[in-house]
A protein has these predicted regions:
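Structural microenvironment flanking redox-active thiols in thiol-disulfide oxidoreductases
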Residues: 64-101, 113-116
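Positively charged n-region of N-terminal signal peptides that target proteins for export
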Residues: 1-5
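Thiol/disulfide oxidoreductase modules built on the thioredoxin-like
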Residues: 100-103, 113-155
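Bacterial N-terminal signal peptides
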Residues: 6-16
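N-terminal "domain-start" segment that seeds a small globular fold
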Residues: 20-44
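Short active-site neighborhood of thiol/selenol oxidoreductases, capturing the structured segment around
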Residues: 43-64
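Conserved beta-strand segments of alpha/beta enzyme cores
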Residues: 82, 106-107
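Structural beta-sheet core signal
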Residues: 54, 83-85, 130
Length: 160
């Protein structure tokens, strides 16, 4: 009985500790290289001071809920922030549903075999990473927690 209780406790600990692990991003450090297989309709977002990459799946209700808010922030800070919606889905499956999100500041990228998800250590979606022009991470977390106040703080931060 003690052995069973020990095993159940160990499994419960592993499950909770795994879900609490941080992603593979260290603020102030370079973000990993993105392995983009292709861009939806070959459209990449215009250059901006900051890039927000959202790790996304078109069937995820959480992703669908967060995307309009992030797009609104991108539009509010015109020219300061662009958005890359990154998915591991096939072009044929996700392309149709994601086409509506394309704009000068928003692009949809298809990950090459999940390599970018792996490089970033993504353990949940929608996960966001914001990095500057030089590729240094300035913010990361759940897409739901990214808002205008957060981006205002990013804009006031001066890199030395």
């Amino acid at each position: 009985m003690k052995l069973l209780l020990t095993i159940v406790s160990a499994i419960a600990f592993m499950l909770t500790s795994t879900s609490a692990e941080a992603q593979n991003i260290i603020l102030g450090e370079k973000v990993p290289d993105s392995r983009i297989r292709s861009w939806l309709m070959d459209l990449q977002p215009d250059a901006a001071d900051y890039t927000c990459i959202i790790f996304y799946h078109s069937k995820s209700p959480r992703c669908q809920e967060c995307l309009p808010k992030i797009k609104r922030i991108v539009n509010t800070y015109e020219g300061k922030l662009n958005l890359i919606i990154l998915t591991k889905e096939d072009y044929s499956k996700a392309g149709v549903t994601l086409t509506e999100h394309l704009s000068d500041r928003v692009g949809v990228a298809f990950d090459d075999g999940g390599r970018t998800f792996i490089a970033y250590g993504v353990r949940f979606i929608p996960f966001c990473v914001i990095y500057d022009k030089k590729g240094y991470a300035v913010w990361c977390g759940h897409a739901k927690s990214f808002d205008e106040k957060t981006f205002d703080r990013i804009l006031t931060y001066k890199r030395k």
